[in-house]
């Protein structure tokens, strides 16, 4: 039965927003419009992943979590810690906005895209993932979707865990959350992860010297947070985390030159906030600072040698957001300010550079009878390209009880990164990349099956491409993306099923050729059940045909990469109420495949872990 009520009573529509690991319709999400609202009131397709899901899947990386979600296509240059890209609904990797606790991820290397192979899985307590345009709420990058990684724990207690696996993988983690009196709580975490890895064998991409070494990964992480409730309505927090990573990879070798095949990444982030949570009005002020230093060097000479490269960026942000309950919905408004500072040499930028952006936005949500309306508008003032406006609107109609039709349209954009603007081949006159998106969807609850099917189109213009003749970047590319997405979840006795299907036709609108590294079709299936206190899980993923470039010879040739079916098997057993042991086999049938041409994947891998809570 569908309940209709205002946001004052936290309305929920049980049949809607089907595909989510946390399937409760009353689940609150914060990413859609920056304040908590029931997931069922978000018209855009939204997925929520909890820490319990991550533990059940026994994921050892953020990429392993995201690859299971609808519309997501992950490519990686090998195994743990190797360079990776996220494609959502066929858009570029730079068209995905990644937030950490609602704050934009600091992008070392000013590449303009997030490499989540470096972000520690130990910090991830929850993931909220929204598909479709969201620039009208968040500004640049939110063309394909938004991934918000939340580090705040929900429950107090202490957990000690350890794990071991293939390729000499080992992981040790301890975390605790404790109450200090009635109004204060503190959270601490420390994590160590290491793997010897394997030889990713970047065939043809390493120049004249073969590199038959293991490409390992090491990560050390610290996290701390202090939260305090001043009154029932006022609260504040201070939070900080940092990680120190080292990655070995196969680099391009030129005779007589150092071999830069080691990456060292230092990253730290700090934020503090003050929140007011009244019955009708909510407000929050958050400030943050992050600093990343990304070295690539030859270990024979060290990271401070003149042959090494350093990408260094500092990011400062201030967010002021407000939300007011109005009728059967709400109105929100806020201001974002951001400053990014680079050092000379970062991203091949000869001089250090500051870029500032101020955004003002307005959001609205209202329920009128059988209809739900959502809209947002934003204007950004950027120190490089000036002003840019975006907007989006959606409407949902419950035409039969338990069934809803949704139509939406939105504009979004991607600002040029600093390397494209001021690098050796840069062009300071670049404009933002622009997107116009349409989507129509049906969703409902039929015979216990919670389902959604949608079709979408995304036209992207002013794409920034490199011109081989002028050796400069220009706004000259166009893309046309059409897709269909279907999701469902249901129970059959003790079995829980979650399934999704994606069809994406992503093409260069000028040449009508497929965009590289995007699978045309994907099928994802998760089966979970409990038998004699054992928790079992089977994951299936089909990756369809994709295209890539062979960079081993010039001119570069386009190559076709066939599809593959992958299976994972995971099991967990609670030895006591405090101690749980887990085991997993990834790539159960040891399939040989690549997501980036020339870079091998790991093959079959085993992990064994245990956790003790008190």
UniProtKB/Swiss-Prot annotation:
Record-listed Ca(2+) 1 binding positions: 199, 211, 213, 215, 250
Q: What does this protein do?
A: Involved in the active translocation of vitamin B12 (cyanocobalamin) across the outer membrane to the periplasmic space. It derives its energy for transport by interacting with the trans-periplasmic membrane protein TonB.
State the superkingdom.
Bacteria
Q: Which GO terms label this protein's molecular function in UniProt?
A: ABC-type vitamin B12 transporter activity; metal ion binding; porin activity
List each copy of the TBDR plug domain by range: 38-152
Q: Does the keyword Transmembrane apply?
A: yes
Alphabetically, which GO biological process terms does the record hold? monoatomic ion transport
Task: Tell me, in one coarse class, where this protein mainly resides.
Answer: membrane
Instruction: Cite the binding residues for Ca(2+) 2.
Output: 213, 215, 249-250, 261
Short motif TonB C-terminal box, span: 597-614
Question: What is the protein's name according to its record?
Answer: Vitamin B12 transporter BtuB
Q: How does it sit in the membrane?
A: Multi-pass membrane protein
Signal sequence residues: 1-20
The UniProt keywords, alphabetically, are: Calcium, Cell outer membrane, Ion transport, Membrane, Metal-binding, Porin, Signal, TonB box, Transmembrane, Transmembrane beta strand, Transport
**Organism, as annotated:** Escherichia coli O139:H28 (strain E24377A / ETEC)
- Keyword Transmembrane found: yes
Q: Which intervals of this chain are the motif TonB box?
A: 26-33
